Amino acid sequence: MASSSRAFFKVFNPAPKSIPRIGQSNLMQLTHKKQLPTFQRRGIAEDSLLPSSTTPIKPMNVETKHTRTMGDIFVQHCQKLELFRNVLRNVAELDALEGLNMIDAVQRLGIDFHFQREIDEILHKQMSNVSASDDLHEVALRFRLLRQHGYFVPEDVFNNFKDSKGTFKQVLGEDIKGLMSLYEASQLGTEGEDTLVEAEKFSGHLLKTSLSHLDHHHARIVGNTLRNPHHKSLASFMARNFFVTTQATNSWLNLLKDVAKTDFNMVRSLHQNEIVQISKWWKELGLAKELKFARDQPQKWYIWSMACLTDPKLSEERVELTKPISFVYLIDDIFDVYGTLDDLILFTEAVNRWEITAIDHLPDYMKICFKALYDMTNEISCKVYQKHGWNPLQSLKISWASLCNAFLVEAKWFASGQLPKSKEYLKNGIVSSGVNVVLVHMFFILGQNITTKSVELLNETPAMISSSAAILRLWDDLGSAKDENQDGNDGSYVRCYLEEHEGCSIEEAREKTINMISDEWKKLNRELLSPNPFPATITLASLNLARMIPLMYSYDGNQCLPSLKEYMKLMLYETVSM
């Protein structure tokens, strides 16, 4: 059995009998957007629809037609993993395109961590054939998979599909499969790649046009590609759709689906156990009782960790990462809900000093929060030092100080009733989003490739962090700007932009914001390409954070989050039928 399989099951334990339970009513009551003050910071810590620590979680019970022990499931699952691993190697050796299709399927099901070595080997060989085909699907699929894996493939591989005028050939409109692959590939574009911009417009237009004459099944597949391109979506969320829409035409796909179903159920149980650990830590910390104004939603905080760190082997890391995320929410509540401006200034000064004696002049509730933050940060630093031989305390302190400084800037804006310039707002909003705090802690908790150079770069907020943070800030601001009848200054980028561009409509401001999100994605895509000073795990986590954002901030007309509700139901509530 492969080592990756053993490592996966090393962290898997059946859910305890006393595990809490999520009910449908609990999910329903958490779908409304929080009413915000007129100038409200929005970021990681904005309220959404996840439950409180008292919300129970239904225990997972893996069942088939015949009752089997977990040991039986483990053995059979590992056998199937090894079988598919051999099939993947053999098929890719004989048929390059089919090998690419297999990798694509593995990634869409979100279980590529099992086959990383095989994928590495196959894609490395594929670099010599980047444009050796006149099939649009094959060229586009190879381009996307290689770029996702860090290989720089030039955009001119698509020149063979252009006419003498330099535009994509209209005859490609008959190749729906190729157009979908081209659209997917265009999502990997970086700044200045005009061919990929054209590819997205060309393929997107023809695919939308095709919806009217395709049968229901194929129209559903095309529509899903347009709404949820793979590169910008969470595989764990879209995998269920892959099961429904993909019809098996060969034996390897049936085998892969079987492997994925078992994986989903086991990972679901693992996530439930992690939530139990987080809930226990939060309860023992006692802040929910001490600070009545603060949110009490450990499951909500955990969802970020679950989305960012998808490899089951990273169970301990997900639990540890949720702890600083909880303090982002807690401190956000202090700045938003409870603190006076004078108290917030004192609290920010205390965090910048990072001395326990700094709490002497704070009100009691701030003393409690600062002491808990101080202890939690020192505890994480000790764990990182013991496990990885590096003391991250200085970097962690910098991240908390930066967050509080940004929160304070926005508190002063709110107190003055004045809107800042849009650029100033976004620059500060990137920090106050909380993304920097989360990814800095994640880097050290993962403990991979910690060097003086990488730490110095991390402390300077690299593009990997700033782009993810900007995407979060702008996505959230799009949601807050939907209501043109809002009173006052809601502090969104859209409102700031409207304020300084007289005559600009809200539709134009929203279009500007959407284009900025696209530009930030291009910057983030550049960070995926080699050489990258950060390990692949942290880069993927940053990417997954950006993928999670639409689920967290896509409000419907009732100011609800249906996509996030569905994600939570799939990941923690529903089993996959065996």
UniProtKB/Swiss-Prot annotation:
Enzyme class: lyase
Binding site for Mg(2+) 2: D332, D336
Interval spanned by the transit peptide: 1-29
Record GO cellular component, one term: mitochondrion
InterPro entries per UniProt: Isoprenoid_synthase_dom_sf (IPR008949), Terpene_cyclase-like_1_C (IPR034741), Terpene_cyclase_plant_C1 (IPR044814), Terpene_synth_N (IPR001906), Terpene_synth_N_sf (IPR036965), Terpene_synthase-like (IPR050148), Terpene_synthase_metal-bd (IPR005630), Terpenoid_cyclase/PrenylTrfase (IPR008930)
Pfam families according to UniProt: Terpene_synth, Terpene_synth_C
A single GO BP: diterpenoid biosynthetic process
GO molecular function, one term: magnesium ion binding
Binding site for Mg(2+) 1: D332, D336
Keyword RNA-binding: no
Keywords (A to Z) from UniProt: Chloroplast, Lyase, Magnesium, Manganese, Metal-binding, Mitochondrion, Plastid, Transit peptide
Cofactor note: Binds 3 Mg(2+) or Mn(2+) ions per subunit.
Annotated family: Belongs to the terpene synthase family. Tpsg subfamily.
Function in brief: Involved in monoterpene (C10) and sesquiterpene (C15) biosynthesis. Converts geranyl diphosphate (GPP) into linalool and farnesyl diphosphate (FPP) into nerolidol.
Domain notes: The Asp-Asp-Xaa-Xaa-Asp/Glu (DDXXD/E) motif is important for the catalytic activity, presumably through binding to Mg(2+).
Protein name (database record): (3S,6E)-nerolidol synthase 2, chloroplastic/mitochondrial
Species whose genome carries this gene: Fragaria ananassa
